[in-house]
């Protein structure tokens, strides 16, 4: 039978992507920093429990930092908007650190890490039956701020999204071969 998995920063995106007959839908718990799912799809996979025990964001959040990927001169925005480079760390504001991580482009790296673990440790893509892996990345405003407040962050998010997609393609090439992949990219239109 076909395997259907969904990995997303948010619960609704994961569940909607896996559908009613999926094998698993996983998202980052905004309170614990661990990947979670729902019992609707059956048992929680051993590989994700193992991942959570040593590699989930809650182990690395203190070292995570989001700075501009490119020199500040490569970002464009209105002159009256902030032109000072941003720097976000996620170990502060204890109650919101994972929510803020989820609304940063760093969450897309986390989605890729879990995706790679799924590809390595599950049976998805390992037989002649077509499987579905639905990946959701985040490309919205940081911490739900206005575009005016975070113009540089938005541009950086898109630059990092490009890198995340490139890493995903490299991963798929090495794990299952791109000749065996049908890739569809769409926007939800909401953040």
Features from the language model and the residues they span:
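His/Asp/Glu-rich, glycine-adjacent segments
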Residues: 1-129, 138-145
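N-terminal targeting/docking segments
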Residues: 95-96, 149, 163, 176
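Alpha-helix capping and helix-loop boundary segments enriched in small/acidic/polar residues
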Residues: 102-106, 145-159, 184
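Extracytoplasmic/secreted proteins, especially bacterial periplasmic and envelope-associated proteins
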Residues: 106, 110-114, 153-156, 160-167, ...
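Short helix-terminating capping/connector loops at secondary-structure junctions
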Residues: 125-130, 176-180
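Structural motif
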Residues: 132-136, 184
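Metal-dependent active-site segment of extracytoplasmic phospho-/sulfohydrolases and closely related
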Residues: 160-191
């Amino acid at each position: 039978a076909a395997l259907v998995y969904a990995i997303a920063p948010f619960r609704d995106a994961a569940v909607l992507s896996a559908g009613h007959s999926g094998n698993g839908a996983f998202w980052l718990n905004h309170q614990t920093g661990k990947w979670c799912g729902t019992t609707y799809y059956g048992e929680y996979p051993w590989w994700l429990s193992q991942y959570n025990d040593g590699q989930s964001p809650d182990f690395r959040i203190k070292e995570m930092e989001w700075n501009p990927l490119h020199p500040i001169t490569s970002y464009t925005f209105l002159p009256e908007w902030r032109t000072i480079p941003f720097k976000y760390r996620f170990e502060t504001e204890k109650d919101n650190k994972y929510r803020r991580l989820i609304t940063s482009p760093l969450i897309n790296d986390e989605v890729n890490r879990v995706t790679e673990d799924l590809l390595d440790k599950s049976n998805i893509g390992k037989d002649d039956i077509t499987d579905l892996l639905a990946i959701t990345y985040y490309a919205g405003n940081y911490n739900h701020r206005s575009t005016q407040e975070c113009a540089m962050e938005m541009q950086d998010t898109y630059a990092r999204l490009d890198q995340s997609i490139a890493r995903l393609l490299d991963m798929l090439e090495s794990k299952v071969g791109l000749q065996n992949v049908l890739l569809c990219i769409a926007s939800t239109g909401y953040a």
